[in-house]
Amino acid sequence: MGSTRLPGKSLMPLAGKPLVYRVLERIIPARNIDQVVLAIPDSAENRVLSEIADELGIAVFAGSEDDLVDRYYEAAKIFQADYVVRIPADNPTPQSSEIDRIIEHHLGLSIPGFSSNLAEVFGSGYPDGIGAEIFDFSLLKDSWQSTYEQTKREHVHLNFFDYSRQIPVDLNWCPISTIDCPTDFARPDLILDVNTAEQYRYMSTLYDDLYPKNPNFSILDIIAWHDNLN
C-alpha cells in the first residue's frame, strides 16, 4: 500500500478484484507450497489487505513497514517455515506450475541456498513476474542477524542476489541457482510486475481481455496477447 512509485497499487482493480487478490488466487493452486501467508505492514491503512486474505482463506502476518527482512523473518518463525518462498505482491500473473518447478529444484539442493525464476537469472530466459524465489530459513536468519544496510533491510533479495546487475552477494555463503525457462515462453523482455501507472494500465488491459475468457490464463496466453497488441 505504501509504494512510493504507485501508492495504493495493492487495491487497484484488475478485472473487478484488487491486484493483491489476483496475485493470491494464482498462487493458491501451487502444489508445493505448504501454506500461503500474506506478510503485510502493521499499520491501519493495510488492514484492508487482511480482509482480502480472509476472503481467500489465507493467513496474514503483520510486521515492520520498512524492514522487510524482519517482517519475513518474524513471519517465517511464527509459521515454522524451513524454507521461504517469496512472491512479490505486485506480480499479478504468477504461474503456479513454475512456482512448483523452482521449489522442486531447490528442495533437491544439498546445501542451503537461494533459487529463483522470478525474473531472468544467469540467462535463464524467464519473463519478469511469473515465478518465485525460495531460500532456506537459516539464511534468512543470518541476514536478519547481520544485515544493517537500509537498502538490504528493505529489499530481501539484495541479501542474496542483485537482479539488475546479475551479481550474487556471496557465493561462499549462499549459492545461487535457477532453472531454464521452457523455450515456448522464454521471454525475458516481458515485464509483468506493476510498479508504475503505465505498467498498471498494461496489466489492467491484459486482465480485462484475458480473465473473462479464462480465469486461469497462462504465460502462453499472455505472450500471444502481448504480441498481438501492435
Regions found by a protein language model. Give the residues of each.
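N-proximal accessory regions
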Residues: M1-P18, I58, A81, I99, ...
